[in-house]
Amino acid sequence: MMRIALFLLTNLGVMVVFGLILSLTGIQSSSVMGLMIMAGLFGFGGAFVSLLMSKWMALRSVGGEVIEQPRNETERWLLDTIAKQSQQAGIAMPQVAIYHAPDINAFATGARRDASLVAVSTGLLQNMSRDEAEAVLAHEVSHIANGDMVTMTLIQGIVNTFVIFISRILAQLAAGFMSGDREEEGNSNGNPMVYFVVSMVLELVFGIVASTITMWFSRHREFHADAGAARLAGSEKMIAALQRLKTSYEPQEASSMMALCINGKSKSISELFMSHPPLDKRIEALRSGQYAR
């Protein structure tokens, strides 16, 4: 909760300062405060709703089935291993689910450290050794212990808010400039069509730029989760698991799920837009101890 409060206060403070600067420069309209509130509600609202519904949406997306009672030795091993790692990491036992997919993958999600979910693919269970699978599970438990889902949501909320706010402000200025004396027209946004088109274009452009910020954090947290897995399961097991991921099918999970999974899509225009670092970089970081605490 402290992390959420600090992020919200920081975001609010920056927005207020930005509003004051607009006021002092005289380019602010009477609707800026309302726009600030609207941007915050939409920017954070969508991100937090997604977080609160994350377990349900993730299970629905992959068709996962939560293990209520283990039906075989593999399911028993999964529960026992995650229970042990959760205790080591100081978090409550997460729910554990299995979903059908040929690729070697797993993910963790949930709104709180003590109300989370770890899901693994059948491809992982069929193609990884127990040591490798143990390391992958430790990676997911580390994500939960680090609070990565909440932090990712807060960062997404902040960038969403600023994308909406700044694009609308600039669109308002552009529309007012192109329509001449907007006050005579009684329309603080100037030409409505210009305002709409410019705001949509700017939201698209700023959204692409903002995605590089969230993807940078996503890559950063993968390195730390790998390091956490090395502490829980051993660095050699984690390196072996990452080596095994090189042999996997291209991930089949939906694009919206990729940032949650241990094995992200390797094909991208640029590493800037990748949710995961290249596997070789992750292995190198483990061997060098770069992210070890």
Swiss-Prot record:
It is found in: Cell inner membrane. GO terms for cellular component: plasma membrane. Binds 1 zinc ion per subunit. Zn(2+) binds at residues 139, 143, 222. It holds the Pfam family Peptidase_M48. Keywords: Cell inner membrane, Cell membrane, Hydrolase, Membrane, Metal-binding, Metalloprotease, Protease, Transmembrane, Transmembrane helix, Zinc. Its cofactor is Zn(2+). It is a multi-pass membrane protein. One of its GO terms (molecular function) is zinc ion binding. The active site is at 140. The chain crosses the membrane at residues 4-24, 32-52, 158-178, 193-213. It comes from the Bacteria. Disulfide bonds: none annotated. GO terms for biological process: proteolysis. The keyword Metal-binding applies. Its EC number is 3.4.24.-. Belongs to the peptidase M48B family. This is Protease HtpX. It comes from Erwinia tasmaniensis (strain DSM 17950 / CFBP 7177 / CIP 109463 / NCPPB 4357 / Et1/99).
